[in-house]
Design a protein with these regions (language model features):
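Conserved short histidine dyad/triad with adjacent acidic residue
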Residues: 33-35, 45-65
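Short, surface-exposed secondary-structure edge patches
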Residues: 51, 70, 85-87
């Protein structure tokens, strides 16, 4: 469940009940059909946070992203492979990946993680002041 702070239209933060969100994801028809399940929790031009649930044996091959990426494992574990290295990320661990790196993930068991992407390309704001 998403909880907005103090119901103000211009709140500065949001809170999420991850346990409830995960339980709801695992009760969805797509999950029961063996599909991965993902939910965008926050999205802006600078950052995106996605809660993702994978079945055991799910493999994800990346594209070469221009963003830096962080995987925070909430449940389960992932095998992470890049051209130069391999590592297993366990529950409670986090992996940060720089931009422009191709990778492959394999869930070793039912796994839930937060995927955060951060835009590393500077945003330029132009001003037409006279």
């Amino acid at each position: 469940m998403l909880h907005k702070a103090k119901s103000s239209a211009d709140s500065l933060f949001f809170t999420f009940d991850l346990a409830t969100l995960i339980a709801n994801m695992k009760q969805s028809p797509s999950w029961e059909n063996g599909e991965l399940n993902a939910m965008i929790l926050s999205k802006s031009p600078e950052k995106q946070i996605v809660l993702t649930a994978l079945h055991r044996g799910t493999e994800i091959r990346s594209f070469q992203s221009n963003d830096s990426i962080t995987f925070q494992i909430i449940e389960g574990k992932l095998d992470f492979h890049s051209k130069k290295d391999s590592v297993t990320i366990d529950e409670g661990q986090m992996l940060t990946l720089h931009e422009n790196i191709k990778y492959k993930l394999t869930s070793m068991e039912e796994t839930v993680f937060l995927l955060t992407t951060a835009n590393t390309i500077p945003v330029t704001v132009e001003s037409n002041c006279m």
